[in-house]
Amino acid sequence: MLDSTTLVALVLGLLEGLTEFIPVSSTGHLLLAGHFLGFESAGRSFEVVIQLGAVLAVLTVYAAKLVSVIRAAPHDPRAFRFLVAVLVAFLPAVVIGVLAHGFIKAVLFETPILIATMLILGGIVLLFVDRMAPEPRYDDAMDLPLNVALKIGFIQCLAMVPGVSRSGATIVGGLMLGAGKRAAAEFSFFLSMPTMAGAFAFDLFKNRDVLDASALGEIAVGFVAAFVAAVLVVRWLLGYVSRHGYALFGWWRIAVGSVALAALLAGY
């Protein structure tokens, strides 16, 4: 029988892993779950560590391709340009994230109504873009030019508002800028590696006094749950969106956001 703290860790880990790489906002789901189930403080402390499980999941799934691209970069201009494109897309998040971190954590993360509203609005945008995005010009993530990558990087910064979704912002940005559905998702995966690793390191430093060594068991449960769930999602997502697009996730966001908003307005 799991005790309540271990169950919280398991729930948070599964939520993080299942929602991090699909465009529904893992942070929004975690914060709303924390609010309604009464473990906001636990959610904040565990989230710092379980992010690492999701980071390692995408690194595991893409390890072979990542190593191949890095090895090819010194003599393959296409591979080199792709690595530069990922780093260029990462830079806006570094600058804006460091400058706005305090405000984001202190204000935006404490506003459940904002989170629910952003889930709904993001779902509407995702449904629109899934139908109305221009004809793709880039069917492979490695073909995205640097100026497109930089624009995606700035669009990613919108996801600092909880409920927007990092993967959602980058995928929508990619689709609107000419990436195919699979290419947009794959570039989002690669961009997540430095972005999430950087966010994890920065949050770990900022919350170093919050983490409790006596809770290593619960932390391990959340970490493993996030890792396993994220591996399964990453392996499934590319094939799914290639065949069906992103409408499912738009409706998911609208449904979750609407239920959460109704509950919040009712006083829960």
UniProtKB/Swiss-Prot annotation:
Q: GO: which molecular function terms?
A: undecaprenyl-diphosphatase activity
Q: Which GO terms describe its biological process?
A: cell wall organization; peptidoglycan biosynthetic process; regulation of cell shape; response to antibiotic
Write out the transmembrane intervals: 4-24, 50-70, 84-104, 109-129, 144-164, 185-205, 214-234, 247-267
Q: Where in the cell is it found?
A: Cell inner membrane
Statement: the UniProt record of this protein carries the keyword Transmembrane:
yes
What catalytic activity is recorded? Answer: di-trans,octa-cis-undecaprenyl diphosphate + H2O = di-trans,octa-cis-undecaprenyl phosphate + phosphate + H(+)
One Gene Ontology cellular component term attached to this UniProt record is:
plasma membrane
Keyword vocabulary terms for this entry: Antibiotic resistance, Cell inner membrane, Cell membrane, Cell shape, Cell wall biogenesis/degradation, Hydrolase, Membrane, Peptidoglycan synthesis, Transmembrane, Transmembrane helix
User: Mind telling me which InterPro entries this protein's record contains?
Assistant: UppP
E.C. number, please?
3.6.1.27
Record's bilayer topology term? Multi-pass membrane protein
Q: What else is known?
A: Bacitracin is thought to be involved in the inhibition of peptidoglycan synthesis by sequestering undecaprenyl diphosphate, thereby reducing the pool of lipid carrier available.
- What is the purpose of this protein? Catalyzes the dephosphorylation of undecaprenyl diphosphate (UPP). Confers resistance to bacitracin.
Q: Which family does it belong to?
A: Belongs to the UppP family.
The entry's protein name is Undecaprenyl-diphosphatase
